[in-house]
Each structure stands twice: as C-alpha cells, then as structure tokens.
Swiss-Prot record:
GO terms for biological process: protein transport by the Tat complex. Pfam families: TatA_B_E. Belongs to the TatB family. It comes from Neisseria meningitidis serogroup A / serotype 4A (strain DSM 15465 / Z2491). This is Sec-independent protein translocase protein TatB. Keywords: Cell inner membrane, Cell membrane, Membrane, Protein transport, Translocation, Transmembrane, Transmembrane helix, Transport. The gene is tatB. The keyword NAD does not apply.
Length: 228
C-alpha cells in the first residue's frame, strides 16, 4: 500500500527503539500492526464500495438504454396505430350516412304481410310449383276432358248389361270403402293379492342376536407325542 522499502523500515525501527526503548517497542509494534490492518481493511472496503458503485452505474446506464429503446418502440407503435385510426376515420367519413346502415328488410321481402299472412301471389306460386311437381294428374284431367268432349260428339255406346253393372259396382265399392275389422276388447278388473311380508317376532330376533354374540369356540389342534 505504502511505497516503503527495506531500508526505510529498518530506519523507522531504529528510531522507534531509541525513542520507546526495548520494553515498550513490542507493544508499540503490535499496536502499529493493528492500526495498519484496520487501515488496510478500510481501504479494501472503500475500494469494494467504489467497484460496487461503478457496477451499479453501468447497470443503471444499461437500464436507461433499454428503457429508451422500449420507449422508442412504444412511440413507433403508437404512431402506427394513430395513422391506422386516421385512415379508418377518413374512409368512414368518405361514405354517406345512409351507406353505413345495413340493408333494411320488410315482411314483403319474405312474401308475407304485416300480420304474417302470405300474399296471394306467393300462394299462386306455391300452387304452380305443386302442379309442376305432379304433372300426371293434370294430364289425366285433360285426358278426361278430351274424352268427355269426344263422347258428346260421337254416338252413344250401347247400354251395359246387368252383369257388367254389378261387377262395376262391386269394384267401386271395394275400392272406396275397405273393410275394417273391429276388435272388441273388454277389461275385467281383477284384485291383485299382495303377499303378506314375513315378519319374525321380537323374541326370535333377540334369540338370534344372542346366538350371534356368543363367542365361537375354535378347535385346538392336539399334538401327538410318540412314546419311545
């Protein structure tokens, strides 16, 4: 710590021996050693404190740089968000107020009036669709109409016989009114006899409990001893 050489130390020791004497010199040397040790520890602690402060300063600088970079990124993101909001506001302001509203629907768009009843046009459209689905019936009706007109224009056919009339009535009656067999079901009330539950008397229950509480005797094994 101090720039003392061997000659300086010998010179200081001679002066201390002359001033203090041989009796007080060892105690003075121990005191000087303790003081020098305290001084060295103090210098070491001061040096460590300086090193700690330097490290803290470096960490503080790094923290400040990191915070500055984070603030810069935050500002750039905020500017980007502000620009996007401004563009959206410009686009929305460019539209007319009625263009912003969704398309309004009325009951007429669904083919019904205010009370929920379908329009006649919708009913006719439904009937037309049904007639398109079943064209055979319409062709059958037109064929019957043409047949009737042809019969009126042509000569009348001869009257059918009694046998033909009876056969036709039988077929039409069987086709129009099918026979339905009815089955009569009668219900007879019968009393159901419920079995009487089997209940044991209190005396029998007490006897069975006592029998269960009795200690059960166990057979002890018997050892056989052979006689010599």
């Amino acid at each position: 710590m101090f720039d003392f050489g061997l000659g300086e130390l010998v010179f200081v020791g001679i002066i201390a021996l002359i001033v203090l004497g041989p009796e007080r010199l060892p105690e003075a040397a121990r005191t000087a050693g303790r003081l020098i040790g305290r001084l060295q520890r103090f210098v070491g602690s001061v040096k460590q404190e300086f090193d700690t402060q330097i490290e803290l300063e470096e960490l503080r600088k790094a923290k400040q740089e990191f915070e500055a970079a984070a603030a810069q990124v935050r500002d750039s993101l905020k500017e980007t968000g502000t620009d996007m909001e401004g563009n959206l506001h410009d686009i929305s302001d460019g539209l007319k107020p009625w263009e912003k509203l969704p398309e309004q629907r009325t009951p007429a768009d669904f083919g019904v009036d205010e009370n929920g009843n379908p329009f006649p046009d919708a009913a006719n459209t439904l009937l037309d669709g049904i007639s398109d689905v079943m064209p055979s019936e319409r062709s059958y009706a037109s064929a019957e109409t043409l047949g009737d007109s042809g019969q009126t224009g042509s000569t009348a056919e001869p009257a059918e016989t009694d046998q033909d009339r009876a056969w036709r009535e039988y077929l039409t009656a069987s086709a129009a009114a099918p026979v339905v067999q009815t089955v009569e079901v009668s219900y007879i009330d019968t009393a159901v006899e419920t079995p009487v539950p089997h209940t044991t008397s209190l005396r029998k229950q007490a006897i069975s409990r006592k029998r269960d509480l009795r200690p059960k005797s166990r057979a002890k094994p018997k050892l056989r001893v052979r006689k010599s």
